[in-house]
Amino acid sequence: MNPSSEGTDGLKQALSTARNNNASLHLLMLYPALPKELQVHQKAFEAFLSERIEASLKNVQEALGGEVVEPTREVMMSDSSPAVVITRYVLRHGYDLLVKEAEDTGGEGGFKALDMSLLRKFPSALYLARPISHSREKIRVAVAVDPITESEDAYDLNIRLLQNARSIADSCSGVLDIVSCWEYPYEEYLRHTPWLKISDEELADAVVNIWSEHRAALDALIADAGIAGENRVHHLRGEARELLGKFVRNEKVDIMVMGTVARTGITGFVIGNTAENVFEKLDCSLLALKPAGYVSPIKAYE
């Protein structure tokens, strides 16, 4: 929780997630170190922040209704980079998921520096919450995957993306939108190069073959994930960096599930490249996963 934020969307979605998964929940509010001349008031300031947590928690629990998980609470001073403090805290305590309210971008898409730092370096599942206007039964959930993988880790990550997204959809509208982008990157080059004589028919056949291979791999991946329920597949032609943000806006997606890591073998999902470009255009909540075995550059103890 951010002491300077009045929003409770992250808290509401964290409580809802914990309830839906019968999980425990710990609330952590970080605040920056006070100036030297104000440090005498640190205890009083922490008491004030604790009161804010209790008030926000009560309001959200009442809004959710029914049985709600009773979380543990903690107020802690951040004496260094918030991304480092958060990551170390999660590593030391072994939490599976971090739910954080996305920093306010003033109505623009994308994520601010702290959230991007967590997307790059945080090792566990990360959920960046934004306001959701739909009622729970109408919440739109989408997942982005690339079935053409070059490693077992990348394949396993795709399976986890599908299964996690399906679980979220089951607790919302029941419908999961599965998005995958394909393209034939040499098409324009082959069409216009004077050095190769390729007929339009040959080129069209090559494009169809690429589409067919990609779609077959996508269908096989979805089958391997073993996800039941209503799954709507969107097999989009073009670059993921251009199409995913448009898809989210046009389809009014509330929650996007994606993979992000330095290198996984997942074409187009390289943080600092395609994935980062996609993140810059997202205006919805985001669940970001990394492959098993990913090691963060931030260590639990240093």
Name each model-derived stretch.
Residues 87-137, 246-299:
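Gly/Ser-rich helix-loop-strand patches that form or flank binding pockets
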Residues 10, 53-56, 157, 161, ...:
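Hydrophobic alpha-helical membrane-association signature
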Residues 44-55, 150, 200-213:
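A short acidic, glycine-rich active-site loop
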Residues 44, 62-98, 222-256, 264, ...:
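Structural beta-alpha unit
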Residues 1-44, 142-200, 223, 281:
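Small/aliphatic-rich secondary-structure junction motif
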Residues 26-28, 72-76, 127, 177-179, ...:
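General small-molecule cofactor/ligand-binding pocket signal
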Residues 186-214, 218, 226-227:
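Flexible internal linker/loop segments at domain or repeat junctions
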Residues 14, 86, 165, 244, ...:
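Aromatic/hydrophobic pocket-lining residues that form π-stacking "cages" and hydrophobic walls in ligand
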